[in-house]
């Protein structure tokens, strides 16, 4: 009976809040509060890309059309005693792909006072939460990258794919925790974070991560299992890249880091009645977890041929957003330098950087934007231009449409003698976002 009553109260609060235009349903008493928030996205993608093979479809059986969904639901429970706020954020795993953002993901405990806020166990670091990118002012979802294939057979050389970056989030959401090996239920590594209160427009934050492979979405704490030689990997779950090169040799690169420090500083200032400026600088530093290993299976035995040292993780991002009346513009630049690379494998280049910008105009419920993104990873480049529009039917309900044209050019980093190859295409998206 108690469970039924609680469910009825939550449902009533959610319905009332959505109808009244509130984005966050709240259930509160004198010193306790339960805040509910959720998100659902449905999207149709249409892709027209050249240089794809006969069986390189967008979905299993459709070459140019696919649907995509994303969802999240979280409850933040807080209790206030003597001006000290203690609480926990609990995120539920949805039946569709989880929304991977700081607002809708990452269960953790937090304590907040007038001196600042401490987060224990959050998968998102200060560099992620305080960062600013140019794309933040854009309309739509910016999800064109879900519908392209920059590692097709045409782009490969000796069966090795080229490395590309198609989104600025690669640099900001902790470089060491954003790999293809993650399944849809995985979360980034656990962190301890501290954020100062906002003072005269300034806010700072810092996070510590002991081991980026210590994720929260996997069954075991130890997500990378090695055999007796500590280089032959018998179980791979997080951040490991194994590349087959000449003579059937394997180069294994563990892209995890230890003792990672992430930090950020933001500044917000009202320049006038209709003008605002936001600035941000964020960065991350970490030590490589292990050496890169060159190996080969000889007579059914895993044999280590050589080991290589990887460079430290050193990444930063600079961003700014300026708003004047109905106009907004944003720009950002991010760099990884030579982070987690070695000249013995990354022969074609070792540096990675990106920059992007966007301008948007909003009038009433309608918002339209134009954005540009360019990245270079090991001298492999991606250029993308996107036009998007969205219409707020009611608070929390936002249909959108966007069209992106992209071009990717490059080659596998291990083979500098390989020819540069290019693929390009156009992606159209139509979708709806629902937030409460």
UniProtKB/Swiss-Prot annotation:
The keyword Signal applies. GO terms for cellular component: membrane. It comes from the Bacteria. GO terms for molecular function: porin activity. InterPro entries: Gram_neg_porin_domain (IPR033900), Porin_dom_sf (IPR023614). Residues 1-19 form the signal peptide. Keywords: Signal. This is Uncharacterized protein RBE_1298. It comes from Rickettsia bellii (strain RML369-C).
